[in-house]
Amino acid sequence: MGTIPNARDLPAGSTNVPVVFVHDAAIDEFISSMLLSVMPGIDLLGLIVINADCISDPALEASSRLLQFIGRSDIPVALSRARGWNAFPWPYRGDCVSFNNLPILAQYKPQVATPPPDGEQLLTTLLQQAIEKAAPLTLLMTGPMTPLIDVLVHDTSLAKGVGRILWMGGAIDVAGNLDPSTTNPAVANTHAEWNAFWDPFSVHDVFKEFAGIHMFPLDISNSAPVSSEFIASLKQQGQSFRYSQLAYEAYSLVTGEPFYRLWDVTATCWLGRPDLYAPARAMPLTIEQWGFEQGWIHKPLVQGSKNSQNIYFKFADLAGFYQYVLTLLATNGS
């Protein structure tokens, strides 16, 4: 499967970057969906929801409501069949319920089939189309990596349809985010990050098959809190722009969680403004698949034994990052 091409390697004449967003429906991922819909040069082809840091039914309902809110009900939404090894704590997974119940979305009736569309089938179809059109996809993945591996296990040739992978996951030089108060201390090691811990085996397989993944670990997202200044700016903009008002109401749901960060928005905004990020550091990585340190991503003990990935450790312009988010949300849509 080999090295993933950079943006400059995408087919000549491409005006928009085809993006598939694979996520697990936390607050930050709903905002990322909005950002992708207004980000210049992005063609959002599909949303695939993983039943990981969410609850599937309200997550799909919220996705449907959000797409109606932004006038993009044409974007397909599907539910992945992925199953994790270590389940997210229930207290984390309820944010999608709160988002689904926001008053600003109440006027929109969810349009979700029963059973919902199959996420792996949607990803397979989009990869096949990408190969036929010679227009590889950018996969923005802000949850576990399981759906990609589940698709490739059935047809490895579909990897040709992957142009780039952006992944919010891991913790390299900082502590992980397994909290012993919500995760049994018998497994709550200090190194693992939840998107890796949920299914460390899929991370291992993706690292083995692909090089050049653009990774946004906790190292960078830790520096992007949902600050009071950011909330105040959204509130002010919300007086004129409904996208900002929705983001304000959504992030207000988590202001009581001091650990909350713009984890997924950090990865998402790189697509539009890579200049806001310090250059990535290329380094080989491995992940612990078993034992107490399960989910820990680190440099391999044997050099030269693993593919090299592109790790973003910090912003070049953190203030510019926040301003970019605010600028994108200063809209009422088309």
What is the role of each PLM region?
Residues 2-65, 109-215, 221:
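Active-site histidine-anchored catalytic micro-motif
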